[in-house]
Amino acid sequence: LDSESAAYHGAGTCTFYGTANSNQMLMEAMGLHVPGAAFVHPHDGLRELLTREAVKMVLANVKSKNFTPIGRMVDEHVIVNAMVALLATGGSTNHLIHWVAIARAAGIIIDWTDFYHLAKTTPLLASVYPNGKADVNEFQSAGGPAFVIRELIEAGYMFPDVLTVAHGGLREYGKLPVKEDDKLVWKDLPKESSDETIVRTAQFPFNESGGLRLLKGNLGRSVIKISAVPEDRHIIEAPAIVFDAQEELLAAFDRGELEKDFIAVVRFQGPKANGMPELHKLTPPLAVLQNKGFRVAI
């Protein structure tokens, strides 16, 4: 417990760009956050001002004669904006499940093919772990969601004229919140990235296409986030080994039976399985084998 507790270095979400932080990014891209609120550190003095601003926005909306419930705000353009933001930042592939459901709740039908077509034309503008070495705090310092959203709007990849919780539409989300004289104000960002190893302009992206590919074959369909996969591992050719459970793979690893090139096929996983099990615990043993030079995939 002590070692586990020591691994958590502060309040808030985990600092890698996983599902929780992808949620934050997409809420910004949908205009459902106070602009710039996504990755402000919990202990930053700006956080309380943003929280107070959120309360003000909620009350102003409720009391307004032009009350805009979420059902009016989330339309096709808003859903597409979120999809583009996910692809432009190399966000979590879990959202290829979540966003299909969210869109359906809004009466909009999307599927993996839509993500794939958008990915082919959406530039990759961010490099945040696991797509790069930076964490979300460094991403925020380099310009964060505001920089990415501004670039995507100016390059024509996002719809700016949508209903948002902040008056002014999505362009307001391309500005940075700052604290001045104990007040919250938003300022324009510099035109250039403050750290091109973390975030880039739409003219000079990390990749011309978003970090996603749709794979199809005689076993079915899958998606892979290639922005997080080194190029020398884009193609793996090896014999398949079939397991009926994650525990079987772990047991085979412990017995030393996996010291070779192979592709692991783990059955009874994924969205249709009971509880939709994830495969996080298989990452360490597979990484050990990769570090030994074996060509391994799952």
Predicted regions and their residues:
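Catalytic or ion-coupling anion/metal-binding cores of large enzyme and transporter domains
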Residues: L1-I298
